[in-house]
């Protein structure tokens, strides 16, 4: 599933996460898999091999995937489908949560 976050900060990083039967494989890259990008540009993708870096990326993805205010997923017809929040649960806005996460790590 493709999840997009459309909010204050412009983001272009692509993270691919494959469960791989309990042994997660993560990759970082620049392409967004559009035809013009794959055939007319040079794009790069690299595996994440360091266990600490891998865990940090998984933590970051967890924050982003919990977004219930500015996140949407792309359906099979390439339409944006906005996530709906449960009325009783906190409505996470991941870019601000992510900012606080990084701020705490640097203090």
Enumerate the predicted regions with their spans.
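PLD/PLD-like phosphodiesterase catalytic module centered on the HKD motif
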Residues: 1-107
């Amino acid at each position: 599933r493709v999840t997009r976050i459309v909010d204050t900060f412009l983001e272009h990083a692509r993270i691919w996460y494959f469960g791989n039967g309990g042994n997660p494989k993560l990759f970082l890259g620049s392409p967004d898999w559009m035809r013009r990008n794959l055939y007319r540009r040079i794009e790069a993708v690299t595996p994440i091999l360091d266990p600490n870096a891998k865990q940090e990326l998984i933590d970051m993805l967890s924050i982003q995937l919990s977004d219930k205010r500015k996140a949407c997923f792309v359906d099979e017809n390439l339409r944006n489908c906005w996530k709906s929040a449960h009325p009783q649960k906190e409505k996470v806005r991941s870019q601000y949560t992510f900012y606080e996460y990084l701020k705490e790590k640097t203090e």
